[in-house]
């Protein structure tokens, strides 16, 4: 069976019309890949259009104020992506003459660009025969080939990258990569994949051995630490006090309401009030209202 021919034929008939697929401009491809990290396509689409409108070129992005970039990014989360993007735009303009690197290895030197993003840009924009391996591709290959090593382990990712490279259509690498990613996104889905109508089902290990619900395998994540974030709304006349975060972290340079973080939940308003008075070094504080606790 010609694996690549099957998925490319499927892709031509079933692909979604997404704006970053209609260009080989590395700026727009890079922009889309950074936005889609940790973000679903439906949510990322509007942000892609907003960024393209506000910063239509790499030079425009590089010359923009960070606060403006973060404002357009607002709501996407993982704000370090936006900061890295700004840093990289300035670096390319200043040090590379405004031109993106064309080779996979050179793209990896850019801040915020990992193996997946570097492979995507190299393949889609510069026709480098490099396999693009994201979560969708891992799922397809794990099921099709019967790979039991966890996809979030070093060994599993090594095997999956090797398999993706072997199956890659090197003459049509960009089309092949787009096809297998799309196939994983809408055909070989995490839950309830469409196996009965799958063009690969006659050769699929998971389908033949009733392992579709088992594969791919993922190592369990480490336990999550509980944090208690106590925010306050401080009003003075018609103004509300906001604090700019200066310490390192995912929210660096973002504005927030005044915060007291605690290891445990405060047992009473009295204890909470004591902490507020200590933090703001004043006795003239009154708790007027409390909002319900929100778990995130």
Task: Describe the residue ranges of each PLM region.
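Catalytic cores of DNA base-excision repair glycosylases
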Residues: 3-194, 200-209, 213, 280-281
